[in-house]
Structure formats: C-alpha cells, structure tokens
Amino acid sequence: MVYTLTTPNGYGYVVLIALGGIPLLSNIQGNVVTFLRKPANVPYPNAYASHEQAKENQDAYKFNCAQRAHANLLENMPQTMATMLFAGLEYPTVTAALGLGWLLARSLYAFGYIKYNKRYSLGGGAFWLCQGGLWALSCATALKML
C-alpha cells in the first residue's frame, strides 16, 4: 500500500526542532556530564556520586546536578517530540514556537541546575508550560480527526 502524507506549510520547522534541536540538546548535556565525570572522580558504571562523595566534593555534587538535569531531559524528550510531530500536523507555527520555548527553557533548567544548584533558578521551569501546551495541541489535533 502507498500512503501520502501532506504536511502543512511550516511543518519543517516542527521537524527541525523535534528531531534536530532536541536531540542536539541531549547530546550537549551528555557531553557536559562526561566532561564533569573525571573531576568528580565518579568511575563507570556508577551513574552518580554517592551522597558522601557529593557532600565532601563540590565537583561530585556538580556532576550529580548535571547528571540529574540530563536524566530529566531524557525523561521528557519522548513525549515532547511525539506531541510536537503530531500537533504540528494541524498547528505547525504554534507547535514550532512552543518547541523552541521548550528547548530554551530546558537549556536554562540545565544551566541553572549545574551552575547554581537550583533547577528553576533561571526560569527553566517554563518548559512545563510549553510541554503542557504541546499536549493540549495534540489533543486538539486528535479531536479534529474524530
């Protein structure tokens, strides 16, 4: 069988952010974790420094913050990418804008967590608003298909 998928104008921006920008951010954060691992003295396969290590060694604490920020990104990536690709079929401009906002907020979240040890210190929690908006647009798209 042959299927034809017609995408709206601007859908390329949705794909560029969902399948380009988001994985790039994950790669960057993964590299930050790798860079911070050696000074923290956390050997593989340990994912985190122990509580005792982090308490005594600021580098270990910073490593844990970077690792947790990256893990949180990985936890939120799949649904964000999926909702973008689906919602963008009906609302490409708003979806691309929310996706870009999500990327920016996730970057601020990670930077604030690593640099200042506070997850929401730089407004990074705004990613939840963007993610909620993408979910709502996905639901609206699904309702239009009924």
Where are these regions (language model features)?
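Short membrane-interface loop/juxtamembrane segments of multi-pass integral membrane proteins
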Residues: 50-73
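Interfacial loop-to-transmembrane junctions
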Residues: 108-133
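Membrane-embedded alpha-helical transmembrane segments of multi-pass integral membrane proteins
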Residues: 22-25, 29, 78, 101-109, ...
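Transmembrane alpha-helices of multi-pass eukaryotic membrane proteins
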Residues: 11-19, 98, 123-130
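Core segments of transmembrane alpha-helices
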Residues: 71-84, 134
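N-terminal signal-anchor transmembrane alpha helix
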Residues: 9-52
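Short alpha-helical packing/oligomerization segments
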Residues: 83-104
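Juxtamembrane boundary at the C-terminal end of a transmembrane helix
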Residues: 139-146
